[in-house]
Amino acid sequence: MAREFSLENTRNIGIMAHIDAGKTTATERILYYTGRIHKIGETHEGASQMDWMEQEQERGITITSAATTAQWKGHRVNIIDTPGHVDFTVEVERSLRVLDGAVAVLDAQSGVEPQTETVWRQATTYGVPRIVFVNKMDKIGADFLYSVGTIHDRLQANAHPIQLPIGAEDEFNGIIDLVEECAYMYGNDLGTDIQRVEIPEEHKELAEEYRGKLIEAVAELDEEMMMKYLEGEEITVEELKAGIRKATTSVEFFPVICGSAFKNKGVQILLDAVIDYLPSPLDVPAIKGIVPDTDEEVERKSSDEEPFAALAFKIMTDPYVGKLTFFRVYSGVLNSGSYVKNSTKGKRERVGRILQMHANSREEISTVYAGDIAAAVGLKDTTTGDTLCDEKSLVILESMEFPEPVISVAIEPKSKADQDKMGTALSKLSEEDPTFRAHTDQETGQTIIAGMGELHLDIIVDRMRREFKVEANVGAPQVAYRETFRAAAKVEGKFARQSGGRGQFGHVWIEFEPNEEGKGFEFENKIVGGVVPREYIPAVGAGLEDALKNGVLAGYPVVDIKAALVDGSYHDVDSSEMAFKIAASMALKAAVSKCNPVILEPMMKVEVVIPEEYMGDIMGDVTSRRGRVEGMEARGNAQVVRAMVPLSEMFGYATSLRSNTQGRGTFSXVFDHYEEVPKSVSEEIIKKNKGE
């Protein structure tokens, strides 16, 4: 089958936002206008096309980024709907990794919210060009220019409107197109009666002012346009569009548009903007990878002629076809039934069938081309972040980094029958989601599950019940504390045992010192003159790594320290790898008294939105939870409190906020960094862990 859409006419985009900004509704409308859906599903009725997992329909939030393909004006638009809730940032990371562009949806009343900041940061990390869609212009308190201001203030982004709204709230009935210098008026809320008209007289002055600002902003990034602009020459619509496209695809400029997806206003213009300004796979830099074994860096260009290379970005278990592996093709062509190499794992895989997904229905296709997003059935060993490539031309594309879980709970099956099913369920769920971990605690024998937040784990337990029919009891949440050293010291570890026959002997001197935050554990060998033979040095490193898993103060993993092996001694007969491993762990224990060990706790960036009258109560509550208030501002008729609060103090906060504000307050929390716990809290943690 020949390629249906050229690479120039392909767009791979994500739709990203804060929870409740109306992202799923926007995606729905896109699918409706591109002819993929015949009846629109409203999120608040629980019938949205993209939100196809049962929990999503109940909670009205998007959890799994469903990948959908749609067509608009001769272009193929592959859309990945990403979740807006902070506990699912890994889903966002995964989808951003394989996109060429994104639409950031904002709520016109709130502007940029905390989760928008998180997702925006992730998109910047991956260099993803973005358009901003200010949605919910029909909502009470909607303010387009305020929202644009928040993009500058909170994201420090070079964003400029390419449209202006006509009216707001229930008066929102049209959109001014600053590029084409025209207006679109809406005769109803169904999106069926749209008229292109001249800009109404009363809006001309504002439109001229903002068109001038737009041209100036684009000209600053384009020398040729700057020359024309300075010489007072007319800049044509085509030149302006080309300038915006160039600046947007190079991630130097972010066009801002407006609308109300719910009221069917502005969605078609949003689709036009996606095609006009977001990049095709040809506009983004070629993906880099390394050749296994040689570590030589290579590029794979977006072309059907290049060898096949793709990245698996999501695994899902489908009730009908089993395991689905979603992948993005960067180069080459893949036919169903063929063999590929999973170069990350070094395994050969057979691609059984290839499916093009539409929310939760699917269409079987025989071939995928460079730039496509599809799902494969039949891959056995492939997990998220793995590279699939041509067996004759191996490459490993850069993988994705996933954050460590910050919260864990003990979980136990309710019956013997549940026990057997629980193992299967947990292994399938952790295969799908790299930030979800399950393990058995060696000491207590309990099964522990860990994730990115309370909601994340709630949904995992919920899915176990629905999809795998496992009933389980869940314990109280536990925080993932860490330990580290604050001082440097040189310590000795000596293991000598003589008990008939061959003895055991290992002796090391290790210099420990604090490392930069986030750098993890670094081991260096500084031995000179062979006082510790080369073959035992890896054992010293391995011994330290093992010992670091259970810290010296309260048994939590030790992070961000450097260790240098500087001296030691050995015995010709009695020394062994095991003896040096033990000596290294003894050195770590000896470091306790000298290296000033401390406990670190995860800190959450919290934003609470409340009516003015509850301000005092909420500030007091944040302080009582050891929180630091970092800023306050008015947003419409509500107050926003931004604070940094320890995760351990956030359990049950939703209930407390509800009762403190009669259900009128909302909050969101996202993991930010680790911080040293105060001495009194540290003593409590140590006591508790020693069972005192």
Swiss-Prot record:
Record-linked SUPFAM superfamilies: EF-G C-terminal domain-like, P-loop containing nucleoside triphosphate hydrolases, Ribosomal protein S5 domain 2-like, Translation proteins
Q: CDD domains, per this entry?
A: EF-G, EFG_III, EFG_mtEFG1_IV, EFG_mtEFG_C, EFG_mtEFG_II
Q: List the disulfide bonds.
A: none
- Per the database record, which ranges form the tr-type G domain? 8-282
Keywords in alphabetical order: Cytoplasm, Elongation factor, GTP-binding, Nucleotide-binding, Protein biosynthesis
Name recorded for this polypeptide: Elongation factor G
Instruction: Give the principal location in a single coarse category.
Output: cytoplasm
Task: Give an example GO biological process.
Answer: ribosome disassembly
UniProt binding sites for GTP = 17-24, 81-85, 135-138
Q: Name one GO cellular component term.
A: cytoplasm
Q: Please describe what this protein does.
A: Catalyzes the GTP-dependent ribosomal translocation step during translation elongation. During this step, the ribosome changes from the pre-translocational (PRE) to the post-translocational (POST) state as the newly formed A-site-bound peptidyl-tRNA and P-site-bound deacylated tRNA move to the P and E sites, respectively. Catalyzes the coordinated movement of the two tRNA molecules, the mRNA and conformational changes in the ribosome.
One of its Pfam families is EFG_III
Q: Which family does the record claim for this protein?
A: Belongs to the TRAFAC class translation factor GTPase superfamily. Classic translation factor GTPase family. EF-G/EF-2 subfamily.
Domain of life, source organism: Bacteria
